Amino acid sequence: MARIAGVDLPRNKRVAIGLTYIYGIGHSKAEEIVEQTGVSTDTRVKDLTEDEVNRLRSTIDNDYTVEGDLRREISMNIKRLMEIGCYRGLRHRRGLPVRGQSTKNNARTRKGPKRTVGAKR
């Protein structure tokens, strides 16, 4: 089983599909990586040679931000927005939608379950 960036790739899938199991690599980036390294697109992960795995590993390590580093970078960006006190940071802090969606009726995913405020008389 090929292990790249701390992730075990599924053995029976094609290489490009297997690479998408790594956080930060989607379909288009996976195709790009396979093309850069010269690995055949039809190759299954279990059929990769050690040399091909090393080429994939080095390409991903050198050219892309993936897994823990990417998660850390994203959380640091959000933390920075919250610290400087900009509008987006305030929305993150309050747990409300950040990108301008209306919150009068929906936004339940971001706001959480309903909390009844008080009965009107």
From Swiss-Prot:
One Pfam family recorded for the sequence: Ribosomal_S13
Name the UniProt record assigns to this protein: Small ribosomal subunit protein uS13
Keyword Zinc-finger in annotation: no
GO biological process terms on file: translation
Acetylation among keywords: no
Species the sequence originates in: Natranaerobius thermophilus (strain ATCC BAA-1301 / DSM 18059 / JW/NM-WN-LF)
Highest rank taxon of the organism: Bacteria
GO MF, one example: structural constituent of ribosome
InterPro entries cross-referenced by the UniProt entry: Rbsml_uS13_C, Ribosomal_uS13, Ribosomal_uS13-like_H2TH, Ribosomal_uS13_bac-type, Ribosomal_uS13_CS
Compositionally biased intervals (Basic residues): 107-121
Known partners and oligomeric status: Part of the 30S ribosomal subunit. Forms a loose heterodimer with protein S19. Forms two bridges to the 50S subunit in the 70S ribosome.
Role description: Located at the top of the head of the 30S subunit, it contacts several helices of the 16S rRNA. In the 70S ribosome it contacts the 23S rRNA (bridge B1a) and protein L5 of the 50S subunit (bridge B1b), connecting the 2 subunits; these bridges are implicated in subunit movement. Contacts the tRNAs in the A and P-sites.
Keywords assigned by UniProt, alphabetized: Ribonucleoprotein, Ribosomal protein, RNA-binding, rRNA-binding, tRNA-binding
Region annotation Disordered: where it falls in the sequence: 94-121
Cellular component GO terms, alphabetical: cytosol; small ribosomal subunit
Lineage of producing organism: Bacteria, Bacillati, Bacillota, Clostridia, Natranaerobiales
PROSITE patterns recorded: RIBOSOMAL_S13_1, RIBOSOMAL_S13_2
Family membership noted in the UniProt record: Belongs to the universal ribosomal protein uS13 family.
